[in-house]
Amino acid sequence: MVGLIEQEPLLHLKKLFEKKQFDKIISFCNDILKNDSKNMIALQNLSTAYIMVGANDDAIKYCEIVLKMYSSDEHALKNKMFAYEKLEKHEEVISCCDIILTKYPDDIDSLVTKGIALNKTGMHDDAIEIYKTALKKDPNNIDALMNIAVTLKFLKRLDDAIKYYDKIQILDPSVKRASIEKYEVFTELGSSDDAFLAAQGITIGEAKEIKMQAKENDYSVQHAYSLRRFYKLQKTNS
């Protein structure tokens, strides 16, 4: 529990973060550290503020000060991970993720971050396994789904990629990137009708119904889609 003496700087820092006054946060934390060089509130918030202003090397410096005192501090490990990610030091990112995951094996953000770092170092098969691990823990995690889909697409495992893009569309139709990427995959496979429907945000299940309707009535998939959309709008407005 945070003591009464500690509440005042925490409340002040919260207000500064809400206003995105990062320079003032840095100055405030440095003032605290002049009197108390091991003050955790100042050290942790200072590293966060440095990340926000792009001073990632400085952020890492203060994370390491914390980690010398508390080697498994989650806040410091994550800030260090984020800072290395910004600096594109992918091996260091992987190392930070491994330390976090040793203590917090269900940390989805760290799993996905490790997967991305593995992608960046060309270890795509390992990245896929990490994303699968994340999805076993959280099957509906959009970040993990998107990253495994993009990786599979890059590796030309197109049929596998489609399944993940489709799940994203089902879970969150507002993720337009899934529709675009799925359209590109179907285009690469030479399936123009499926590509058209994917671009409209249509899922595989819906696409099967539309294509069946087009076949039964002997008209184009585009026409079947337009009719389906018209009837839906008509039903909504009635």
What are the residue ranges of the model-derived segments?
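Structural marker of alpha-solenoid helical repeat scaffolds
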Residues: N35, M69-Y70, K103-Y104, K137, ...
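Structural register within alpha-helical repeat arrays
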Residues: H12, L46, K80, K114, ...
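TPR/TPR-like (Sel1-like) alpha-helical repeat modules
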Residues: Y165-K176, I180-E209
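Position-specific recognition of the canonical hydrophobic site in helix A of tetratricopeptide repeat
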Residues: F17, Q44, I51, K78, ...
